[in-house]
């Protein structure tokens, strides 16, 4: 985890540090067990291919969790994640790099709260955005 980020130090348009993940088949099975999502397209190559896929695909909700981890690593320990939303626009295969990124789109104060809005997304190994989203976080003040 990096040093604490403060509200006064962030600027609209700035990107936050990225998070790289390369989920493998074991992580997909572990996610299935934890989430209860045992749909075979996430772990059975033959089933995935019979359903028109190249092979098993990463759970969308796992990519959502990675985006949450990206935000947590950026705001912690003193900031808080208030909202995370994303949509699943592309299928990602296991054992391939996923890079999770964020860009500050707005910052403002609401009462005593220091609010930062971000565009967030996951990119596949080719740089294609497969999971676009948005987030709202609060950051501590230096004051």
What does each of the following model-derived ranges do?
Residues 1-16, 94-143:
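HotDog/MaoC-like acyl-thioester-processing domains
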Residues 73-96:
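Mid-chain, well-packed structural core segment of small domains
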């Amino acid at each position: 985890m990096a040093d604490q980020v403060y509200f006064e130090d962030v600027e609209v348009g700035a990107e936050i540090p990225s998070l790289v993940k390369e989920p493998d088949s074991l992580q997909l099975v572990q996610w299935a067990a934890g989430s209860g999502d045992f749909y075979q397209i996430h772990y059975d190559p033959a089933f995935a291919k019979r359903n028109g896929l190249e092979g098993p695909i990463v759970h969308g909700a796992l990519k959502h969790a990675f985006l949450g981890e990206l935000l947590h690593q950026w705001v912690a320990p003193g900031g808080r994640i208030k909202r995370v939303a994303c949509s699943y626009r592309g299928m990602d295969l296991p054992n391939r790099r996923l890079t999770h990124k964020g860009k500050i789109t707005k910052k403002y104060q609401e009462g005593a709260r220091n609010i930062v809005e971000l565009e967030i997304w996951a990119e596949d190994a080719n740089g294609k955005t497969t999971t676009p989203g948005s987030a709202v976080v609060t950051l501590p003040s230096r004051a």
